[in-house]
From Swiss-Prot:
The modification Phosphoserine is found at S1123, S1370, S1413. Keywords: Phosphoprotein, RNA-binding. Residues 966-975 have a biased composition (Basic residues). PANTHER family: LA-RELATED PROTEIN LARP4B, LUPUS LA PROTEIN-RELATED. Signal peptide: none annotated. This is La-related protein Larp4B. Residues 983-1004, 1164-1173 have a biased composition (Gly residues). One of its GO terms (molecular function) is mRNA 3'-UTR binding. The HTH La-type RNA-binding and RRM domains are required for its function in negatively regulating organ and cell size. InterPro entries: La_dom_prot, La_HTH, RBD_domain_sf, WH-like_DNA-bd_sf, WH_DNA-bd_sf. Residues 262-351 form the HTH La-type RNA-binding domain. It comes from Drosophila melanogaster.
Amino acid sequence: MEYFLGGYVYMNGDALKIQPPVYTNVPVETAMLATNLFGATTQIAASPAAAAAAHIPLITAAAAAAAAAGAPAVAPPVAVAPVATASAAQAAVVPAQQQQQAHPHQAQILAHTHVAHQQQQQQQQQTIQQHLHQQQQQQSPHPAQHLTYGHQPALSQATAGGSGTISGGAVGPSGVVVEGQDTNEYAIMNGALGQTQDGTVVCYTTDALNNTNLVALDPQPHQIVVPVQVPVQVPVPVQLPANGSADPQQGSHNAAGGEEPNIPLDKLKQMLATQLEYYFSRENLANDTYLLSQMDSDQYVPIYTVARFNLVRKLTNDINLITEVLRESPNVQVDDKGLRVRPNRKRCIIILREISNNTPLDDVKALFSNESCPRPISCEFAANNSWYITFESDEDAQKAYKYLREEVKEFQGKPIMARIKPKSFINRIQAVPKNGYRLTSPPTANVFDPAGAGGATVSYAAAQQPRYLYTNGAAIAAPASVQYSNPVLIPIPQNQFYPGLVAGPWPPGTVAATTAHGQNFYELGGNIFTTNPLPPQPVTAGFAQAPPPTSQAMVTPKPQGGGRYNNNHRGNPNNVGGANSGPRAESRSKPPRSTPSASHIQGGNIMPIQITAPIPGGMVSVVPTNIVQDPLQPAPLQQQPQQVIQQIQQQPSSSAQQQQAATVQMNNTTRHYPIKSNWKGGMQKNLDKSYSGGVATHHHYTTQVQALPAHSHHLQAQQQLQGQTQQQHYQLASSSAASAPQVTYVTTAPAPQQPGQHQHHLVVQQTQPQQQQQQQQVVLQQQQVQVQELQEAGDGVEHSSHAMQQVNRSSNMSASSSSSLATSMSKEPLQWQNRPRRRRRDEEGGINYSPGGRVGLYGSSPSNPHPQQHLMSSSTGSNVQSAGGTDGGGASHRGGERQSHYNTIHDVPPPQHRGNYKGNNYNPHYHAQHSSMASGSHHHHHHNALSSQQQQHHLTTGTGQQGSGHHYHHHHHHNSIGSNVGNSGGLGVSSGGSGGGGSGGGSGSNSLSGGSNERGIHHSSLGYQGHQHQHQQQQQQQQQQQQQQPAAPVQPPQFDLEDAAFPPLPATSATAPHTPQATGGASLHNSTTSSSSSTGLGQKQTLHQQQQQAPQQHQVLSSSVESAGGDEQRSSNQQGIETSNIHLANSSTANNWVENRLSDVVRTGGGGGGGGKGKARKDNRHPQGQNQPHMAPNYQQHQPRNPPVSPTPALGAEYGIQIQEGNNTKNVTKQSSSNNNSIHVIKCQTPNINASSKEEAAGAQQQQQQQLDKSNKTEDEMHPKQPSQQRLVEGYVQQQQLPLLAAHNEYSAALAAGAGACSVVEGGLTTSLAECSLGQHKKPPSVAALHAKKDANLLEKGASKHKSVATSTSTENLSAAATASKLSYAQVAQHHKAAASSDSKETGSGGSTGTLSPTGSHKMDLVFGDPAVVVAAVEKSGLATVSTEKRVAGGASPAALIGKPAGGLPATNTTQGSSAVVVSAKEKDNRPNASVRPLSKEKQQQHYGSATEHNTNANIGLGASGNRKSRANNS
């Protein structure tokens, strides 16, 4: 592949004008290597002294003495590794571009690497070296003088642009120029630049010295020391006389006085043999991609090729002598004609198969203890019942083999299965690019060991001209971290990014190459990839994340998204955000190094797309054609990761973008980056995770995106945030993710995304059917808005894209929220990509690692991508995802918006959120961003953020819209909350949870179940009391937009932040999903809202919230709540809700906690820390101080209030509603669970879900009711739970829940019918849930319902199993719960059984919690597979367990996860959590456990008696548990 276009060689993304002397068709590797493609941009024209000083290989340190001339000096020093010496300082390091311009010879040098040049240059160089020496002597005075390139001999002093030490740039694998003085390798075209210990710089080059302009300058002395690289291990630095005594014609010797021309023949032959054998040694061939590339199918290499290697030419140019030496070498084999040589592989190992490792070694050795059998050198067991017996030679191995086959034949009664191990010295796979590009630095040659020479690591510099392995370059070339599928990917331009990129998602900047062609040489990538079979997408963006963006074949949309080179790229010149662009080292504003013309991209796969319209800067999207071509294929998976990253990235972007909306997409991008940075901590994780492949996210991003997507994508895809971005970049960024997002919803182009999203959405659809429905509706409604908003706000975008996609997908829209969630997830995916570890789960669908390990959040969602998205939602919701998740855009929004939001609307609030949610800063950011995006953007656009929420809201109810319109902030809050919830719920925890983020995060965390909860708590946490309410409401609103309305007004600003964070209301987005959230969320949410509200807001607000929540709680709930009216309803709601609330608070807290934990969004401020959690959350998020107090008082208020209410019929009525909520929760849970179940164990989860639902309802209502509920409904599912419930009820005596019970029963019945679907809440919801929970994304509602029923039955049947396995949700669990808070999962489970009845009563909620926990825990394991966490949760408190269980039950993996900490308890607890809470309310004794659950109920009542404890427990336990629960709900 040629690395040149129109006479320009692109190096490091910069165009070098190729001089005539240089061959334009310099192999890419050559050019690239020559230019340090892998390193920071090489200072092509740095003064030699500077270069030497900086240890930066100068490509054509062509400053000629020109340093003196000043040309190099003129060039501003490039970011060179810190210049080591003053001389370096003296000599201005010229950026590669300048150097290029200044020193055309660079190109020469590049070309120089070619043999021809080498030869010419040898002579020239000799002369040059002489000149150099002269110059250098002169340089003593002018350290700045540059090496002159041989082409321009003496004159070149001033003009020699060409002669530079070419080196890959002493760039470390990280791609950063390494400053190391002594040990740095300097990749010189064919040599290494090293500093001897005395400080002189030596250019270790092989003939390169002769042929190439590799001269090392002594930085200080400015004397050029040319190391004589004799085959001697250590090159001897020879100081050339000023006039360069070296004989220019010593073609074979170094100009620097290479070998003595008079080396004795025998010694020369020995040296040649050593060098040549090294080339064919296994060690060298393992890394010598060039040599391997020159081999034919028989592994023969033309001898003339080897003879041209610099180190060989240094010794001799006599090819006959070389052939003779090769013939004499036992290690190589020369063909009959004497033209080719190949390594002589010894096959001296015999493999004995089917001999177990139990066989005594002596027995195996005894096989060969025969006179007719050669004695083996070693005998060892390899693997797979195989033994390796090594012999001294090939002949011995052959003899032994013959002996075994003909004489022994059997061993231990079995025929001997022996074969001679073929020693393939070369693994000819793509890992070995033909261009000789090395992934690893070449091993130092034995002959010329640079190490001896003072640290030139590369001694045998790529000896061969064709082997342009700049050792250093090679080393650099492959920044270890950067995983180029094929070495071809040489992200030279952005060394700076390597460390980070490599380590994490690639910064978008890298991807920006296309846009800034100059900037990245990704452009090349397109060509290169084309040439090399590398997929373009990986090229730039996600080296690691290779997922083809195929799914994104939204070329068209992509343009909107901008190509990977879009604004998203930090480097992207188009980026408006430019300077801001990114957290990356490079400022976005920085002009592209030299923007290659788009034509550069012409290379095969990449299709440059100029997107002018939507993207402010107009971006060139380079979409790999293949991506375009097959958008749908791998994309989903890839997208998920990539998209996740994109989402994640975009989230930040979203935030920015949402703020800036379309206009500043670039800025957004820019912001995105910063956000990215921010996210790195909390969000990025999320971001990193591809939540959902980032599909939706990207979509969302799209809008935002465009810069973001690319950015995000890039960053995430690259990072995997960027991984997705980049990959997705290609997919997303390039194809649809970035664009798609906009386009997505615009175009839905993201068909590919859709795949990812699809899955996500699908899952989401099912998982978030409700959400989807809501969201869809909302999306649809909002879609229009969202489209605008989306564009404006990533939130919207995501949503929009979701909407679009969802629309495309159908349910997805519905799931828009869900989808959004999913999308959010998608967005998150971007972010997630950073957290790849979770991402896969994402893909698994079972566990979405929402950022934070909110894996299970959308456990349901996980069913597939959708689940992922769902999860993402959840997760996304949680984090950015949450924002995106919920919002779809929400998560993103959360991520992006949040910041944006922050930036925008929440400039102030975000701080609160941010400040408050320290841990969750990200989340807060998320939140804030989300908020920002959601809120700010969404604020305004609340649609956007709301998008998810709004969508949800819209979908959910007028309130949604109302909330939306009603309060952008509110909405936003809601969004935030919703987002958070959804997000949080989904991921909400993470992000939404993150603070509201904090609240939202909390909410988010609780998002699903905690959504409300979280939000509620959030609200509480946020201490917006109103806000929290709103959050809760939002959560609820997610669940129902009702909440939005009232709460919104209260604290829009703060909320916004949170809301923005919440926007990802994945769960909430869709009514159904929302419902599930609502159920969990309603119940939980409501509760949470109540609780949170009550906690955070104070009862009024709480009530208000609850009311809203209740209403939000889904239409069903809303009516109930509304019926209940205000406080009472709140109360009842609170009871139920509070139970939930507490639970939720717990959930919220827990969720947040979990979320934090999961999200890594430390958002809870302690993981929320139990009551503190809610509070902490609150605190974190908002002025904590107040909130906490608020919380405490609120809780207190609520506690009392709740209890009273609980008992009241109002509660019953409300609870009916709430139950519906509960149902919803269940639904959600179920859904989640179901999805999770699908993913993991449906049974377990379903029961959990049911339990959760029931629990929620029952818990919310009262244990009794719950019992009944469970009896009625969850008999099957929660069969064990039923008893548990009953016991709880008994223990509780169900003071308050009889009425509720009735409602609950109904609800339960509905739930039972819905199985996981929770149809009761709303038929639609149930079905949605059923769909979701069934996880059969595709199942129609009816089918879903059937499935739900089946699930319920299964649950019934499996309930006991689960019970036993998960410690089930039965009374045992409850009683165990009490203990559970104190016990490990196993203990809890056992304990549950033993103490179920008595403990249940005593522990009441504690028992309940315990009971739930075990199941939850189990589920969690299933869902999250994070027992430790569960245990921790359990330890945190029974309540935590309860919440967890609920969460788990809810199918919120995160919840489950958290629940896990609780032990097995969490899931069960969670489910029973409500009950437990109720019980707690009823029974203070069970505070530890009760405190978990009681958060909502008892917490208010009792907790406040034991407010501290309760809070602590609640927060902690709740934090863990509530969160869990919430999470479950969320999921």
